[in-house]
A protein has these predicted regions:
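Alpha-helical protein-protein interaction modules
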Residues: 172-199
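Internal amphipathic alpha-helical repeat/solenoid segments
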Residues: 18-24, 41-42, 46-58
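Long, compositionally biased charged/polar accessory segments in the mid-to-C-terminal portions
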Residues: 42, 139, 183-186
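Canonical positions in the second alpha-helix
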Residues: 18, 52, 85-86, 131, ...
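Helix-turn-helix repeat elements of alpha-solenoid scaffolds
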Residues: 2-13, 34-47, 69-84, 115-129, ...
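Amphipathic alpha-helical repeat scaffolds of TPR domains
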Residues: 1-6, 10-13, 20-34, 56-72, ...
Length: 199
């Protein structure tokens, strides 16, 4: 697989070199960002998203990709500022909250003093919580697979953050919710590794 990634990097750089920046849709910018992120070209993916935002102002998905690429490149602080602006602008979606929580989680992991660790753990839990409660998992039907998958990510991460913040009751509560989500996914035919691992 790594050989395939190495082969595609030059092709993607060439694709960006000849990319029609003025006429391309936000969807085309987004797709190129996704391709670049998939092969580890995080800084170039960020540049693509930022360029796309010059032509497609306030495109939520491009903002998310720019921040996600920065986070992957090791700049969670800058990524968190971008995502905080999205939230302040009214974006209450699961994806934005989860990306922001993930940036806070990275800052928590990178922190060396206990005050910073506590602060970023609390921020991550709060944002994962916002993402999780955007759609109450209790109201989701097994047939709503995509929504269930979307709910799983913030839910299991709340459990993770509670566990490493020594709140074992909170960790257990959200681990159980994540397990129930996986049961619903499995009953709907979803049988990926992370569903089995959670159960």
């Amino acid at each position: 697989m790594s050989q395939l990634k190495n082969i595609s990097k030059p092709c993607l750089r060439t694709k960006w070199k000849f990319f029609d920046r003025e006429k391309s849709s936000s969807f085309e910018y987004f797709n190129l960002c996704e391709e670049l992120i998939a092969v580890g070209e995080f800084l170039l993916a960020h540049d693509v998203a930022k360029t796309g935002l010059n032509y497609h102002k306030n495109d939520k998905k491009l903002c998310q990709r720019a921040a996600h690429a920065l986070c992957k490149a090791g700049s969670p602080k800058t990524a968190s500022r971008m995502l905080e602006q999205l939230v302040a602008g009214g974006d209450c979606g699961v994806e934005t909250h989860s990306l922001l929580a993930s940036a806070y989680k990275d800052l928590w992991e990178d922190s060396t003093d206990q005050d910073s660790k506590k602060k970023y753990a609390e921020l991550a839990i709060a944002r994962y919580g916002e993402g999780f409660f955007t759609n109450s998992y209790d109201n989701l039907k097994a047939s709503q697979r995509k929504e269930l998958e979307t709910q799983y990510y913030p839910c299991i991460n709340i459990s993770f953050m509670y566990f490493f913040s020594d709140d074992l009751e909170g960790a257990k509560e959200y681990a159980e919710k994540a397990r129930k989500i996986c049961e619903k996914l499995k009953s709907g035919g979803k049988n990926e590794y992370w569903v089995q691992a959670t159960e």
